[in-house]
């Protein structure tokens, strides 16, 4: 994201704390291997600093930080430490083998924390800052000091703390909105005042770290930069304590998109953001909300007819960034009751249909009626609306019978009889489990190149006699089809769903073949 017109004074350092603050989110614990995967990803996408963990918290955390420090090629690797000598020693040991290591130490500064948590006086805390920052600086050249709960700390005392930390050797000063209490103008002003009043402020980089308790984490982070901060601490997907942290993807795209009013830049490659979101979501088992900015499923999806019409004519009518800029292939037009005729026609063309005006209008009327009754409209639903012969085409493959031999030892075996274009074929196959055997039998009887993307089983009702509803998604030539089938026998339902998906692929190929030949 660098530009010849920008300078280092306008550069914003991106400090990712997904592996430390993000993992403190209840339920978001990652395995050692998952931490290494996330760290490698962050290192390659242009993140400047990776806070890899809290080394003294556990043996596992120490080992993860140490391993990440050894492996990182680009990013500074930071280890967190309380203002306790043993913590600082442990953090120093963890980042010792990093190409560029950092110790990040912190202490509370607000009256409520000093009185009720630390039970220390203001002078006591100033002494702690001097001693612990100096200790850290003796171990590494890069030391970050944080004033915990800085936004509820009186400005005069906060200035004294910052001056003390810099004098002791801190190279970065982080002023976190620990409890998500600040509002943007207040936070911007705090940085401006401190940088003006602290005599040695020019010897350190100032940093923001904002929590989202009031939904202002990203706004506050950007306000802090306007006040003179040049490091933003954030996490992928905004995960973190309580309501979370500033989301890295939102911070990066705000800087990239609004350069007209925020003349800053950062090193993160924006096309990696969607993949990063998915990797962290999978590692933490925390799903990304559908309407999440930048990386949510609906971030580039449009259902309103007015919006769909505008996007089809010119994407910039309703999109302030391109989906490709964040690693999404294309804008998604979600077909539903709000969709207009233009978007419906566009979807039909994607599916290989070119209808006359009267046919299009008739299909559109039936589509709107279906959308009023059905929550989710799939491509297959639309195909069924406009193809009167679709049902017969889907019956080209039909399950006649299925026998599966399963046991506790050895491979499972499936014997299947399928009707293909009116002719019965029979064959058998083995697999690692009965479902695998069934699907292998289908492949033997009906050779194809489709890949299985999804296999799900749900009980339709309660009880041991419940029907099983099986969903199968197959992909071929970069396009996917989904089919469902229900049966009291899960294996029969699985076979029917798989065959139904193949029928849809065959139907699509037949429909598009004349178009391909004509082109």
UniProtKB/Swiss-Prot annotation:
<comment type="similarity">
    <text>Belongs to the alpha-IPM synthase/homocitrate synthase family. LeuA type 1 subfamily.</text>
</comment>
<dbReference type="InterPro" id="IPR002034">
    <property type="entry name" value="AIPM/Hcit_synth_CS"/>
</dbReference>
<protein>
    <recommendedName>
        <fullName>2-isopropylmalate synthase</fullName>
        <ecNumber>2.3.3.13</ecNumber>
    </recommendedName>
</protein>
<dbReference type="Pfam" id="PF22617">
    <property type="entry name" value="HCS_D2"/>
</dbReference>
<comment type="subunit">
    <text>Homodimer.</text>
</comment>
<dbReference type="GO" id="GO:0009098">
    <property type="term" value="P:L-leucine biosynthetic process"/>
</dbReference>
<feature type="region of interest" description="Regulatory domain">
    <location>
        <begin position="398"/>
        <end position="519"/>
    </location>
</feature>
<dbReference type="Pfam" id="PF08502">
    <property type="entry name" value="LeuA_dimer"/>
</dbReference>
<keyword id="KW-0963">Cytoplasm</keyword>
<dbReference type="InterPro" id="IPR054691">
    <property type="entry name" value="LeuA/HCS_post-cat"/>
</dbReference>
<dbReference type="GO" id="GO:0030145">
    <property type="term" value="F:manganese ion binding"/>
</dbReference>
<keyword id="KW-0464">Manganese</keyword>
<dbReference type="GO" id="GO:0005829">
    <property type="term" value="C:cytosol"/>
</dbReference>
<keyword id="KW-0479">Metal-binding</keyword>
<feature type="binding site">
    <location>
        <position position="211"/>
    </location>
    <ligand>
        <name>Mn(2+)</name>
    </ligand>
</feature>
<keyword id="KW-0432">Leucine biosynthesis</keyword>
<dbReference type="Pfam" id="PF00682">
    <property type="entry name" value="HMGL-like"/>
</dbReference>
<feature type="domain" description="Pyruvate carboxyltransferase">
    <location>
        <begin position="12"/>
        <end position="274"/>
    </location>
</feature>
<dbReference type="InterPro" id="IPR013709">
    <property type="entry name" value="2-isopropylmalate_synth_dimer"/>
</dbReference>
<keyword id="KW-0808">Transferase</keyword>
<comment type="function">
    <text>Catalyzes the condensation of the acetyl group of acetyl-CoA with 3-methyl-2-oxobutanoate (2-ketoisovalerate) to form 3-carboxy-3-hydroxy-4-methylpentanoate (2-isopropylmalate).</text>
</comment>
<dbReference type="InterPro" id="IPR036230">
    <property type="entry name" value="LeuA_allosteric_dom_sf"/>
</dbReference>
<keyword id="KW-0100">Branched-chain amino acid biosynthesis</keyword>
<dbReference type="GO" id="GO:0003852">
    <property type="term" value="F:2-isopropylmalate synthase activity"/>
</dbReference>
<dbReference type="InterPro" id="IPR050073">
    <property type="entry name" value="2-IPM_HCS-like"/>
</dbReference>
<feature type="binding site">
    <location>
        <position position="209"/>
    </location>
    <ligand>
        <name>Mn(2+)</name>
    </ligand>
</feature>
<keyword id="KW-0028">Amino-acid biosynthesis</keyword>
<dbReference type="InterPro" id="IPR013785">
    <property type="entry name" value="Aldolase_TIM"/>
</dbReference>
<feature type="binding site">
    <location>
        <position position="21"/>
    </location>
    <ligand>
        <name>Mn(2+)</name>
    </ligand>
</feature>
<dbReference type="InterPro" id="IPR000891">
    <property type="entry name" value="PYR_CT"/>
</dbReference>
<comment type="pathway">
    <text>Amino-acid biosynthesis; L-leucine biosynthesis; L-leucine from 3-methyl-2-oxobutanoate: step 1/4.</text>
</comment>
<feature type="binding site">
    <location>
        <position position="245"/>
    </location>
    <ligand>
        <name>Mn(2+)</name>
    </ligand>
</feature>
<dbReference type="GO" id="GO:0003985">
    <property type="term" value="F:acetyl-CoA C-acetyltransferase activity"/>
</dbReference>
<dbReference type="InterPro" id="IPR005671">
    <property type="entry name" value="LeuA_bact_synth"/>
</dbReference>
